[in-house]
Amino acid sequence: MAGRKEVQDQTNPTVRTVPMSYEALIEQYLAGPGLLRRSVAGMTRGQLLARPIAGKWSTLEVVCHLADYEPIYADRMKRVFALKEPELLKGDPALFAERLAYDRRDVEEELALIELTRKQMARILRALKPEDFQRKGSHSRDGALTLKTLLQRITGHIPHHIRFIEEKRRALSI
């Protein structure tokens, strides 16, 4: 089977066959939490809460934003796979940051939530058939989105925000 790779789930000895392109995307998706964890490593609570760049979120706020959107995207992907063209609601990151106690949250809890959500979703994604990645949902703002598009978007979400964390670290000289 050219262009395909067998993937063995370590906790389930059943061999799943996933297209290589999807497996590579799933691997990138799984790598995100480690990248995020490394980007905040060694930061004190004060540094996590600091806003060294005017008008920008603190590092903790960035991590909380990422943690809030992981279950949202997981739900969207599950609904696209399980339901027929489900409605996918948009979120409001600024409203979440304002109302969801970002300054009181614990960075380790947020990182753990991201890691566990992605591990669970990767297990589900690896069980899918190639055609399942073309299933669609209807986003309230963006219109029709495939499961593949949702996976690509959430996979790129952490790397996108790591740039801002690195910018804050430079501004704090850490």
What positions do the PLM features span?
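Short linear motifs at secondary-structure transitions and domain/linker junctions
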Residues: 24, 31, 64, 88-90, ...
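Acidic/His metal-coordination segments adjacent to aromatic residues that form catalytic metal sites
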Residues: 17-21, 56-59, 96-110, 141-149
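Alpha-helical bundle segments that constitute or directly flank the non-heme di-iron/ferroxidase center
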Residues: 14-45, 68-79, 153-156
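Acidic/histidine-rich alpha-helical segments that form the ligand environment
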Residues: 28-39, 97-134, 154
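Short, contiguous alpha-helical
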Residues: 2-13, 49-93, 122, 134-174
